[in-house]
Amino acid sequence: YLPT
């Protein structure tokens, strides 16, 4: 996942 992409950290936001």
Swiss-Prot record:
Superkingdom as given in the UniProt entry: Eukaryota
Protein's recorded name: [des-Arg1]-proctolin
Keyword tags: Protease inhibitor, Secreted
Entry's Gene Ontology molecular function annotations: peptidase inhibitor activity
A GO term from the CC aspect: extracellular region
Other comment: Is a stable peptide that is not originated from proctolin hydrolysis.
Localisation: Secreted
Tissues showing expression: Expressed by the venom gland.
Key word Chaperone present: no
Function: Venom tetrapeptide that inhibits activities of the human peptidase neprilysin (NEP/MME) (Ki=0.94 uM), the two mammalian endopeptidases EP24.16 and EP24.15 (Ki=36 uM and 74 uM, respectively), and a probable cockroach neprilysin-like protein. It shows 3-fold better inhibitory activity than proctolin. It may play a role in human envenomation as well as in the paralysis and death of scorpion preys. It does not inhibit ACE activity.
